[in-house]
Design a protein with these regions (language model features):
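Intrinsically disordered, Lys/Arg-rich N-terminal extensions and targeting peptides
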Residues: 1-31, 156-178
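Structural motif
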Residues: 7-8, 64-66, 139
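Short, ordered loop/turn segments at secondary-structure junctions
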Residues: 14, 72, 143-146
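Generic preference for flexible, low-structure residues
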Residues: 23-25, 38, 42, 81-85, ...
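Long, charge-patterned amphipathic alpha-helical coiled-coil/hairpin "stalk" segments used as oligomerization
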Residues: 25-114, 126
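Positively charged, low-complexity, intrinsically disordered RNA-binding extensions
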Residues: 95-178
Length: 178
C-alpha cells in the first residue's frame, strides 16, 4: 500500500451526491463516488447542511482512500458574519462590511480545531483572520460601525443568491462595454 497523492475538495456538508462536480475529481483517482458520498454524509450529519466543508483526500495504491474534514474557509465565515455577498473589488479603498473583534475571536476558536492550526495560539489565528478580512474589504473594529448596524436585517440564506445576482450584473455590464 503506497501513498499516491493528496487532493482537496470543497463539498457541502450532509448533502453530498454522486454529481459531476465530485465525479470529475474522484473519477481519475479510482475512488467510488457513491461510497465516498455515503461515508462523507455519515461523518457530516451533525453539521448544518450545505456548509462548504474542506475535504482532504489521501489516495493509496490499492484503490483505497482516507479523508479528513476541515472547517470552511475564513472568507466564508467573514462573509456570513458581515452579511456581505462578496468581498470588495477594491479592498483597501472600499469597505463593504464590518465585524467586531469578538466575532473574529469566535471564528478563530472554530478554526483552531483544524489539524494544521492545532497548537497555534489564538491571537496568531486572529491576526490571520484580520488579514483576510482586510483583503476582502471588511473592517475589523471593537464595536460595529454605525453604517453597518443594519446588517442583521439581511438574511444569511439570501447571501448566495445575492452573490449570483451581482455576478450576473457584472457579466452583463462587461458584455455591454464591448
Amino acid at each position: 500500500m503506497r501513498f499516491l497523492g493528496r487532493y482537496r475538495l470543497i463539498v457541502p456538508a450532509a448533502v453530498a451526491k454522486p454529481s459531476p462536480s465530485i465525479g470529475q475529481a474522484l473519477g481519475p483517482l479510482g475512488i467510488n463516488m457513491s461510497d465516498f458520498c455515503k461515508k462523507f454524509n455519515e461523518r457530516t450529519q451533525a453539521i448544518r447542511p450545505n456548509i462548504p466543508i474542506q475535504v482532504l483526500i489521501y489516495t493509496l495504491s490499492n484503490s483505497t482512500y482516507k479523508f479528513a474534514l476541515r472547517t470552511p474557509g475564513s472568507q466564508w465565515f467573514l462573509r456570513r458574519i458581515a452579511r456581505v455577498p462578496m468581498g470588495s473589488s477594491k479592498p483597501k479603498h472600499e469597505i463593504v462590511g464590518n465585524v467586531t473583534l469578538k466575532e473574529v475571536y469566535h471564528i478563530a476558536k472554530c478554526k483552531s480545531m483544524d489539524p494544521p492550526l492545532i497548537g497555534i495560539p489564538l491571537y496568531v489565528i486572529c491576526k490571520r483572520i484580520i488579514g483576510t478580512a482586510n483583503a476582502m474589504g471588511i473592517a475589523v473594529t471593537r464595536e460595529l460601525l454605525p453604517e453597518f448596524r443594519k446588517r442583521d436585517y439581511t438574511k444569511v440564506s439570501q447571501l448566495d443568491q445575492m452573490k449570483k445576482d451581482i455576478r450576473m450584473q457584472r457579466r452583463s455590464q462587461k458584455r455591454g462595454k464591448r
